[in-house]
Curated annotation (Swiss-Prot):
It catalyses: (R)-pantothenate + ATP = (R)-4'-phosphopantothenate + ADP + H(+). GO terms for molecular function: ATP binding; pantothenate kinase activity. It is an enzyme of class 2 (transferase). One of its GO terms (biological process) is coenzyme A biosynthetic process. The keyword Iron-sulfur does not apply. It is found in: Cytoplasm. Homodimer. InterPro entries: ATPase_NBD (IPR043129), Type_III_PanK (IPR004619). The gene is coaX. This is Type III pantothenate kinase. Belongs to the type III pantothenate kinase family.
Length: 248
């Protein structure tokens, strides 16, 4: 059985998955630490999406060299797997966003909003243009939920490092900070859902991934009743599989 090692090197964590090459089934997955995962020995090739900069790439290169496997460092392109990249300079689009959009399109084959709620919160719009074809129309990047909270705590003297919970009617500073950051993220998502829905003339599904997606999901489901919300944990890793296969 041929396997692909997919690696998503993000700003906070490096996630990996071993996927069955023919089907894309995830056989093993994890978060990279100091040890070389034993499961990597199952693989015959490696696909990497790195948005963490050259230092992280150098560390990964040193580890992957020990495996002796062919490695492809993916980048965003003008077109891949049925999706056209609307960026003025396609290569400047973060490859994690590109991979997530490709996976979302391949899974759902319809206009959709793709949200990655990590260190940054990215919200990207895909429009179906023809059977099997889509276009990335544009998207936004804003501080992620935790980064918003940490930035406020470091910049405001009377807030400090506090851990609140979401409440409809916050009555403490820590809960107000937590609730405010989640409302900010959910509001941005709602705005782009409305924008894309008006363009496409239909209710738009929202595909969520990233570490803070679980925190955003209940708020979105409660207040945005006309949209379908789908939680996908491994969009970037699955997108790398599609990119590696070069599926149409």
């Amino acid at each position: 059985m041929s396997c692909l090692l997919a690696i998503d090197a993000g700003n906070t964590r490096t996630k990996w998955a071993v996927l069955q090459y023919e089907t894309g089934e995830i056989l093993q997955r994890g978060v990279l630490n100091d040890d070389m995962p034993a499961e990597w020995a199952l693989c015959e090739r490696v696909a990497v999406a790195n948005v963490a900069g050259p230092n992280r790439q150098a560390l990964l290169e040193a580890r992957l060299k020990l495996l002796g496997l062919p490695v492809r460092w993916h980048a965003s392109t003008l077109h891949a797997c049925g999706v056209s990249n609307g960026y003025a300079i396609p290569a400047q689009l973060g490859v994690d966003r590109w991979a997530a959009m490709i996976a979302a399109w391949q899974h759902y084959q319809r206009s959709c909003l793709v949200v990655n709620a990590g260190t940054a919160l990215t919200v990207d719009m895909i429009e179906s243009t023809a059977p099997g074809q889509a276009c990335f129309l544009g998207g936004i990047i804003m501080p992620g939920i935790r980064l918003m909270q940490e930035s406020l705590a470091s910049a405001a003297a009377n807030i400090g490092a506090m851990h609140g919970v979401f409440r409809d009617f916050p009555l403490s500073t820590q809960d107000a900070v937590c609730s405010g950051s989640l409302h900010a993220g959910a509001g941005a998502i709602n705005n782009l859902l409305t924008l894309l829905g008006e363009r496409c003339g239909e209710a738009i599904p929202c595909i969520l991934s990233g570490g803070d997606a679980v925190a955003l999901l209940p708020l979105l489901q409660k207040h945005i009743l006309h949209s379908e919300f789908c939680l996908e944990e491994n969009l970037v890793l699955q997108g790398l599989w599609y990119m590696e296969r070069g599926l149409p």
